[in-house]
């Protein structure tokens, strides 16, 4: 996965990574050989990253701390951090934001069993305390259908169902 937020991504800072592949063979690859793209990398689900060398930008300690506090507050204000979730449920589609499309379809607060489209941020599916994997799967499918029916865009889940 090429995780990212607030204008930065792992592809921007990864110099190299060491990992175990599915055959438990230790491998190493340079950052530019990891096939990073939007929310994707060449790592397979069975690969385990053991370590990574990251190249970060130097900065003034207090400025970095202030930026961290700013981003933490921004997340608290806009994301449902008070409930369990798997984070962002859908990848950003071309031409818009999944959360805006879900909200536009009137799905904030929509529930299937114990799974709910967050009322705080429509891009998150939260667990109200008793959600099953089936609840989450059905909710994701319902959201995809509703958004597709309204916009013609099929949202791609960011959550990997195992």
What is the meaning of each model-derived region?
Residues 1-15, 85:
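A gly/ser-rich beta-alpha-beta helix-loop segment of oxidoreductase catalytic cores
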Residues 20-21, 26-138, 142-162:
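Phosphate/pyrophosphate- and phosphate-bearing ligand-binding catalytic cores of soluble enzymes
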């Amino acid at each position: 996965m090429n995780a990212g937020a607030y204008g930065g991504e792992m592809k921007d800072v990864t110099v190299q990574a060491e990992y175990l592949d599915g055959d438990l063979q230790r491998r190493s690859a340079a950052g530019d050989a990891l096939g990073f793209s939007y929310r994707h990398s060449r790592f397979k689900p069975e690969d385990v990253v053991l370590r990574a060398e990251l190249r970060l930008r130097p900065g003034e300690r207090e400025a970095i701390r202030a930026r961290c506090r700013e981003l933490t507050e921004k997340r608290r204000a806009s994301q449902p951090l008070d409930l369990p979730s798997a984070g962002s449920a859908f990848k950003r589609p071309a031409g818009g934001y999944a959360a805006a499309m879900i909200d536009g379809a009137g799905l904030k607060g929509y529930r299937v069993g114990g799974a709910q489209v967050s009322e705080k941020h429509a891009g998150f599916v939260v667990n109200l305390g008793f959600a099953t994997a089936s609840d989450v799967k059905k909710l994701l499918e319902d959201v995809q259908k509703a958004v597709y029916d309204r916009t013609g865009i099929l949202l791609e889940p960011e959550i990997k169902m195992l």
